């Protein structure tokens, strides 16, 4: 299998080398060899003496290797340090699965250094297994079976490894509402059956430190009692965080670490603690006191990402042994937690041994190669060449599945620095395994120029030669240290080479020598850079037909401005000097309402090309010319006596021409119709007035007044008649109602209230005869 990988590794290496050689050199403000090396991985420096000519900057020494060779720099004079990787031989003794153990990298900015890491899975590697169990009431039958597992569990480990140890811990949930019932009686016995003996709820209890004594495991687990809580999710993530954060209390060795997490329900995570008024985020530290997580009610649950980071940091591989209904939930959790597995637990945990074996085989047959946190200036990628023939390139971490015992697999690691970095180190590890690779990183930014670096005569005995460039002594500057500063600082000298305080020295196109700009010679053919501050050139002008200033026949470029030859004009000399296309029939340029540019009228606002004759949006000054129309045509109105003086520039046209129609009143109240015909220029009009006017007779005042008075009187009489009729009808209706009431008031008997004025008395003694 190694033979199959070698050609692929060679191909990747060749492609990387070809890519590096084909890179361009984007140099900027380069004056030294170090500046050049930092400019990019494609840049190289020529240390040949007198390689740069008169007026050329030192930056011409910095270019791609191909360009430098083409310019006459021999290969021995080209300084081009490359990124390197040096591996240290593996230490003898011990069972090592990862090699090499130490690598030293010399990194040039932008250029990757590559090295190979080999992983060989060992047989019988030591294992520590910690069994973390949910003791909520629904796990009662599971606890009964786990109490019998001690010897079987350790025997199962010994089938896999020569050195196995087991430990035990349990969890329920935080002991505050709404997670558990906080009634004192329920806190003492949280089980639904009061006759059942249960232990008080707790967050996490470390029961048994990792041991190889199966009898001790069975004894300690046998003492455990079931507990209970209120809500369905459990506090399992709290317990896992403590198992990972307390290595000494748990007893972890530097071997393969397995954490079996057994539960039949989901889990609380960060933010759920707010339901119980717990706001402080989980700090990821160990808080075990007397083997109990007593600070559970002070810290929120950990987030899944926080737990994943802690497990990876502690090199712990979790195995989630969950019931059928929770398998999909925990499979999603394994997508976030690397090197984790899920197994379906039977309702009574009777298959836990088989589950652990299968999960371990699955975990140990897959290898992830990863590194610890790095600064932004370093980038690490992995190419994985697996034993099953599957390959992956440029991945953020190495990944191979189906790894077999004693069959090596190769990872190619590529490390790239974005700038010259400080010396530092980082660690590469295979997740779930204890072996690591320590990578020491050093910068590769210095130029090792082994030529006449001590020759001072080439620099006028006032400096030394370094990589083909003079490095002047204090008080001297210049390409050959020929300029003495005479006590002036470099800032003062450079100030006279700046156009203003905000500009760069010599516009970035020259060198400041003794306070004066010496402009560079351009690499562009026929381009000349000049000016006091090298701010001018003969190429930076507008172009016409792809040529600067339209070509030498049309114009020449002087300091960003085109100077046109005779017969041409325009910002790029693109126009012929002619106005023929701008003249109207009268020979007036743009009708006096625009300017002729490039033989085309540029009309004033509102007027339309081609000759600026029409202005659809302009307002017609009809009222302003009404008095002139009256005096010129009818010899009346306010201007009648001095019409020639007031309207001297306005002509009366004998016949109607195209123009704007106007209707205005004259001094006699008649309506005039006339046409305004615009002449060349602005506000210049001639008139054509219609012969007839429309005069309207004045109103008959007497008829209007008489009609108005008569109308008012008639309206008044009509209103009185209506009022009288309505009044009569109302009286008639009231009279009829009175008559009707009168008929209703006739009596059939005497009025009981009436008393007659005559009284008749009968004499009883009187005898009738």
Curated annotation (Swiss-Prot):
Binding-site residues, Ca(2+) 2: 173, 229, 231, 233-234
Instruction: Please give a single GO biological process term from the UniProt record.
Output: phagocytosis
Q: Which residues cross the membrane?
A: 701-723
Xref: SMART domains: INB, Integrin_b_cyt, Integrin_B_tail, PSI
Motif stretch (Cell attachment site): 397-399
Recall the GO molecular function terms of this protein's record: amyloid-beta binding; integrin binding; metal ion binding; protein kinase binding
Identify the residues that the record assigns to the PSI domain, covering every copy. Answer: 24-74
Q: How is it modified after translation?
A: Both Ser-745 and Ser-756 become phosphorylated when T-cells are exposed to phorbol esters. Phosphorylation on Thr-758 (but not on Ser-756) allows interaction with 14-3-3 proteins.
Xref: InterPro entries: EGF_extracell, Integrin_b-2_sf, Integrin_beta_N, Integrin_bsu, Integrin_bsu_cyt_dom, Integrin_bsu_tail, Integrin_bsu_tail_dom_sf, Integrin_bsu_VWA
Phosphoserine: modified positions: 745, 756
UniProt cross-references to PROSITE patterns, sorted A to Z: EGF_1, EGF_2, I_EGF_1, I_EGF_2
Positions annotated to bind Ca(2+) 1: 138, 141-142, 264, 347
Could you tell me the keywords of this UniProt record? Calcium, Cell adhesion, Cell membrane, Disulfide bond, EGF-like domain, Glycoprotein, Integrin, Magnesium, Membrane, Metal-binding, Phagocytosis, Phosphoprotein, Pyrrolidone carboxylic acid, Receptor, Repeat, Signal, Transmembrane, Transmembrane helix
What is its membrane topology?
Single-pass type I membrane protein
> Where on the chain is Pyrrolidone carboxylic acid found, per UniProt?
23
Domain named I-EGF is located at 449-482, 483-535, 536-574, 575-613
- Read off the Pfam families from this record: EGF_2 (PF07974), EGF_integrin (PF23105), Integrin_b_cyt (PF08725), Integrin_B_tail (PF07965), Integrin_beta (PF00362), PSI_integrin (PF17205)
Q: Record's superkingdom?
A: Eukaryota
The record lists Mg(2+) as bound by 136, 138, 234
What family, per the record? Belongs to the integrin beta chain family.
Biological role: Integrin ITGAL/ITGB2 is a receptor for ICAM1, ICAM2, ICAM3 and ICAM4. Integrin ITGAL/ITGB2 is also a receptor for the secreted form of ubiquitin-like protein ISG15; the interaction is mediated by ITGAL. Integrins ITGAM/ITGB2 and ITGAX/ITGB2 are receptors for the iC3b fragment of the third complement component and for fibrinogen. Integrin ITGAX/ITGB2 recognizes the sequence G-P-R in fibrinogen alpha-chain. Integrin ITGAM/ITGB2 recognizes P1 and P2 peptides of fibrinogen gamma chain. Integrin ITGAM/ITGB2 is also a receptor for factor X. Integrin ITGAD/ITGB2 is a receptor for ICAM3 and VCAM1.
Q: What does the domain comment read?
A: The VWFA domain (or beta I domain) contains three cation-binding sites: the ligand-associated metal ion-binding site (LIMBS or SyMBS), the metal ion-dependent adhesion site (MIDAS), and the adjacent MIDAS site (ADMIDAS). This domain is also part of the ligand-binding site.
- Output this protein's name: Integrin beta-2
């Amino acid at each position: 299998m190694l033979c199959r990988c070698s050609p692929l590794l060679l191909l990747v290496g060749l492609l990387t080398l070809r890519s590096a050689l084909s890179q361009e050199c984007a140099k900027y403000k380069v004056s030294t060899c170090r500046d050049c090396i930092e400019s990019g991985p494609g840049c190289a420096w020529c240390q040949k003496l007198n390689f740069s000519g008169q007026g050329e900057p030192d930056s011409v020494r910095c270019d791609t290797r191909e360009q430098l060779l083409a310019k006459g720099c021999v290969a021995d004079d080209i300084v081009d340090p490359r990124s390197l990787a040096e591996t240290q031989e593996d230490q003898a003794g011990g069972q090592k699965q990862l090699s090499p153990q130490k690598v030293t990298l010399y990194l040039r900015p932008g250029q990757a250094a590559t090295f190979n890491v080999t992983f060989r899975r060992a047989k019988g590697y030591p294992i520590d297994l910690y069994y973390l169990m949910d003791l909520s009431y629904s796990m009662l039958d599971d606890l009964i079976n786990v109490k019998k597992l001690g010897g079987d569990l350790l025997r199962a480990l010994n089938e896999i490894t020569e050195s196995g140890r087991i430990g035990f811990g349990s969890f329920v949930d935080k002991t505050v509402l709404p997670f558990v019932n906080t009634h004192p009686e329920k806190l003492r016995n949280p089980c639904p059956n009061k006759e059942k003996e249960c232990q008080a709820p707790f967050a996490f209890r470390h029961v048994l430190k990792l041991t190889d004594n199966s009898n001790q495991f069975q004894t300690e687990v046998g003492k455990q009692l079931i507990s209970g809580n209120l809500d369905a999710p459990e506090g399992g993530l709290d317990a896992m965080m403590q198992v990972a954060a307390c290595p000494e209390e748990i007893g972890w060795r530097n071997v393969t670490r397995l954490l079996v997490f057994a539960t039949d329900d989901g889990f609380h995570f960060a933010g759920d603690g707010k339901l119980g008024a717990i706001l402080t985020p989980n700090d990821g530290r160990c808080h075990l006191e007397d083997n109990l997580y007593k600070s559970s009610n002070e810290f929120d649950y950990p987030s899944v990402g926080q737990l994943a980071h802690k497990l990876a940091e502690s090199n712990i591989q979790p195995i989630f042994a969950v019931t059928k209904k929770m398998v999909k939930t925990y499979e999603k959790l394994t997508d976030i937690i690397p090197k984790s597995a899920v197994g379906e637990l039977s309702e009574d945990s009777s298959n836990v041994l088989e589950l652990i074996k299968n999960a371990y085989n699955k975990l140990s047959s897959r290898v992830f190669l990863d590194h610890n946190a790095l600064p932004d200036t370093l980038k690490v990628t992995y190419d994985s060449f697996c034993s099953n023939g599957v390959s992956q390139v440029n991945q953020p971490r190495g990944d191979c599945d189906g790894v077999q015992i004693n069959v090596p697999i190769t990872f190619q690691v590529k490390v790239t620095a974005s700038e010259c970095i400080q010396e530092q180190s980082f660690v590469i590890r295979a997740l779930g395994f204890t072996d690591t690779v320590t990578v020491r990183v050093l910068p590769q930014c210095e130029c090792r120029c082994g030529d006449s670096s001590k020759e001072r005569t080439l620099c006028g005995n006032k400096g030394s030669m370094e990589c083909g460039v003079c490095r002047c002594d204090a008080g001297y500057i210049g390409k050959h240290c020929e300029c003495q500063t005479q006590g002036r600082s470099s800032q003062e000298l450079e100030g006279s080479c700046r156009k203003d305080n905000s500009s760069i020295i010599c516009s970035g196109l020259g060198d400041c020598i003794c306070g004066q700009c010496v402009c560079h010679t351009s690499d562009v053919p026929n381009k000349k850079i000049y000016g006091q501050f090298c701010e001018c050139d003969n190429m930076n002008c507008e172009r016409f037909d792809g040529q600067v200033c339209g070509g030498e026949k049309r114009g020449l470029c002087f300091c960003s401005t085109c100077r046109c030859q005779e017969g041409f004009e325009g910002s790029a000399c693109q126009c012929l000097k002619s106005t023929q296309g701008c003249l109207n029939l009268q020979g007036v340029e743009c009708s006096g309402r625009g300017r002729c540019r490039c033989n085309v009228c540029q009309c004033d606002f509102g007027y339309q090309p081609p000759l600026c004759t029409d202005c659809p949006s302009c307002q017609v000054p009809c009222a302003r010319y009404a008095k002139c129309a009256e005096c010129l045509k009818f010899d009346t109105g306010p201007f009648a006596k001095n019409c020639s003086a007031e309207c001297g520039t306005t002509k009366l046209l004998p016949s109607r021409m195209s123009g704007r129609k106007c209707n205005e009143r004259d001094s006699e109240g008649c309506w005039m119709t006339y046409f305004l015909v615009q002449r060349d220029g602005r506000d210049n009009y001639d008139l054509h007035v219609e012969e007839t006017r429309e005069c309207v007779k004045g109103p008959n005042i007497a008829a209007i007044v008489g009609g108005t008075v008569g109308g008012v009187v008639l309206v008044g009489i009509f209103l009185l008649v209506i009022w009288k009729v309505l009044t009569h009808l109302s009286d008639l209706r009231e009279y009829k109602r009175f008559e009707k009431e009168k008929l209703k008031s006739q009596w059939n008997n005497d009025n009981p209230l009436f008393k007659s004025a005559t009284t008749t008395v009968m004499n009883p003694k009187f005898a009738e005869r």
